[in-house]
Amino acid sequence: MKKLLFVFAGLAFALTAAAQEFRITHGPYLCDMSQDGVTVVWTTNRPALSWVEASPADSLAPAPPPRHYQTVAGRKLAGRTLHAVRVRGLQPGTDYRYRIFSQEVQSWPDVNNVTYGKTVGADASRRRAYGFRTFPAAGSGCSFLVLNDIHGKADVLTRLCKRVDFSELGFVAFNGDMSSSVESGEQLFKDYLDA
C-alpha cells in the first residue's frame, strides 16, 4: 500500500511541475556596469536560451535592436536557468532601454538537435522597456549605495531602503554578509535580492 501511495504522490508531483507555465522567476538585475557594457542577470523556472535586446533610449530606429546572448567561445549557451548576458559596445554616460527574453528548451537529445518552446519576456506587462545609464567617462562623478551586514533579514533591508531614491543612484553594491549562510540559490533572492 505504501508503494502505491508513493507512486501516486510522485505522479501528482510530476503533473503539477509539468503544469507550471514557463516563466522568468527573478530579475532582471544589472551587474558589472562599466562605461561600455553591462551584464543583465535573471532566472527562469526551466532551462532556456536567453538574450537581451538593447538600444539607446533616444533611438527611433524602426528595426529591432540587436540581440546579445550569453556565449562561450562564440557558442550560445542554452539549457540553463541562470542567465547572465553581457551587453557590449555601449557609449559612456548614455541612457539605454532593454528587454530580456528566454525561449524554453523543451528537449536536447544531442548537440545538433534542440527543440525550443515558448518565448517569454520579463517586461510583457510593462508599457515600456527597462532602462539604465552606463557609467560616465573618467573624471565624472556618480552616486551609489553600499549595503552590507543584512544577514538575510530582508525586512531590515526594506526598511533601510524605504527613503532611497534609486533613480538617483549610479549603482548599488552588496558589500558582504548579505546572508548568514547560503543553503540554496533561492535563498539569495529571499534574503536580499528580491527585498
Q: Can you say where each PLM-predicted feature lies in the sequence?
A:
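Hydrophobic h-region of N-terminal signal peptides that target proteins for export
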Residues: 9-18
